[in-house]
Amino acid sequence: MSNIEERVRNIIVEQLGVQLEEVKNEASFVDDLGADSLDTVELVMALEEEFDTEIPDEEAEKITTVQSAIDYVVNNG
């Protein structure tokens, strides 16, 4: 697991209050991890802060799974 992947997973655990074992790459924040719309906004904000980047709203809407969050940070962070 890469450092970025590990950091993204830790943010998800902290923001959504889930166990690390639940944070699988294919897991949907809403369907699998129980996030609501406010949780997803806060998650994106936490990613922006951790990786010192700004995620435009249209891109943030596409970040719906653990893997999509990792991919975004790897490609744009």
From Swiss-Prot:
Free-text description of this protein's post-translational modifications in UniProt: 4'-phosphopantetheine is transferred from CoA to a specific serine of apo-ACP by AcpS. This modification is essential for activity because fatty acids are bound in thioester linkage to the sulfhydryl of the prosthetic group.
Pfam family, one: PP-binding
A biological process from GO: lipid A biosynthetic process
Gene Ontology terms, MF aspect: acyl binding; acyl carrier activity
Pathway terms, separated by semicolons: Lipid metabolism; fatty acid biosynthesis
Modified residues (O-(pantetheine 4'-phosphoryl)serine): S37
Keywords: Cytoplasm, Fatty acid biosynthesis, Fatty acid metabolism, Lipid biosynthesis, Lipid metabolism, Phosphopantetheine, Phosphoprotein
Family matches, as InterPro entries: ACP, ACP-like_sf, PP-bd_ACP, Ppantetheine_attach_site
Record GO cellular component, one term: cytosol
Function summary: Carrier of the growing fatty acid chain in fatty acid biosynthesis.
The name this protein goes by in its record: Acyl carrier protein
Organism: Psychromonas ingrahamii (strain DSM 17664 / CCUG 51855 / 37)
